[in-house]
């Protein structure tokens, strides 16, 4: 582990282990701590970067919790200043923009995990309730994603007829529904369940499958399909 001095303080730098591991085996072989350490590059006075990465992930519980946090919780971690906070906010925003910029025809939602990650990138930071529909072809490739309805902090009005009309226009074989709960709690309301039933019945009339409805909170989600509601 190398160290350098700055204005009387010792800044502990990362050794080349995680970088060398990435170059030799690929990024997928690295742990969350190792990837985070590569991005942060240096630790804080008296703390090497791997220890800092582990401490950050333990404090916030997950990568999602870390990258979506505001500045206040960082003040509880000694030595983490505005520069480190800015780095973390930048990587979170880059991840969201990466998902948004991927061409639709290259994005196939082949697993619940991919679907959840994709939708979290679209919805987790929204300050109002929005209702998004992903229109899919027969191979589960995205034809288009549309935010069809936008509401208030606690409610969004959804019209099944408009969803069906757009699905037919796009010749979609299936759709995935999603909306966010800005409050942070992902548990669906009774109204969420009722509107989902109405959409499913409307889509059945034109032979379009509703594959799932995901409710996205802060650091949590609920899948109607996983709970057996669809």
Swiss-Prot record:
Residues 108-230 form the MPN domain. A motif (JAMM motif) lies at residues 179-192. It holds the Pfam family UPF0758_N. GO terms for biological process: proteolysis. It comes from the Bacteria. Zn(2+) binds at residues 179, 181, 192. Coiled coil: none annotated. GO terms for molecular function: metal ion binding; metallopeptidase activity. InterPro entries: MPN, RadC_JAB, RuvA_2-like, UPF0758, UPF0758_CS, UPF0758_N, UPF0758_YicR. Keywords: Hydrolase, Metal-binding, Metalloprotease, Protease, Zinc. Belongs to the UPF0758 family. YicR subfamily. HAMAP family: UPF0758_YicR. This is UPF0758 protein ESA_04094. It comes from Cronobacter sakazakii (strain ATCC BAA-894).
